[in-house]
């Protein structure tokens, strides 16, 4: 949400339960648009099968790289649907960033995407769920400081990680 053009965070989110893309699907996107930055490649791939009336997809219509792909297979359609759902969610949450406290935004993301349930179902799920809850608590405490906003919160968490602070 902070900056979709960062390749590693974007790839991590796309392969997480949020995007639910497989390694093969990620490779399909990259090979379809090898000369575009990854964010633009994802957008261009999604636009191949996107609905022009879709608000989330319409935000990325500027990218028109050539993939040389003629296929409209079921696999492509499934990937397009995943990307459409992902970009719709991103557009929804990004629209809320300027006026929603970080802890409320995190809580909504966790609840509406099913991320909390997904984390709880993983090995050591109870500990993982506790870590997610702690992140929301840290966001709430952060909102009480003089700093505000998602960008500053991401930097704050980065500093905690950098100095190996147990949060």
Predicted regions and their residues:
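Conserved helicase C-terminal RecA-like lobe
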Residues: 1-167
């Amino acid at each position: 949400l902070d900056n979709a053009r960062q390749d590693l965070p974007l790839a991590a989110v796309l392969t997480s339960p949020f995007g639910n893309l497989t390694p093969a699907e990620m490779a399909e996107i990259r090979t379809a648009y090898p000369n575009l930055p990854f964010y633009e490649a994802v957008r261009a791939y999604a636009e191949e099968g996107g609905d022009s009336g879709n608000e989330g997809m319409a935000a990325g219509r500027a990218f028109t790289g050539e993939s040389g792909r003629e296929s409209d297979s079921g696999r492509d359609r499934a990937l397009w649907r995943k990307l459409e759902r992902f970009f719709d969610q991103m557009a929804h949450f990004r629209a809320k960033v300027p006026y929603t406290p970080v802890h409320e935004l995190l809580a909504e993301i966790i609840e509406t995407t099913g991320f909390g349930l997904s984390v709880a179902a993983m090995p050591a799920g109870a500990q993982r769920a506790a870590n997610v809850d702690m992140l929301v608590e840290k966001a709430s405490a952060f909102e009480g400081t003089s700093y505000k906003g998602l960008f500053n919160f991401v930097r704050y968490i980065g500093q905690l990680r950098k100095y190996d602070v147990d949060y």
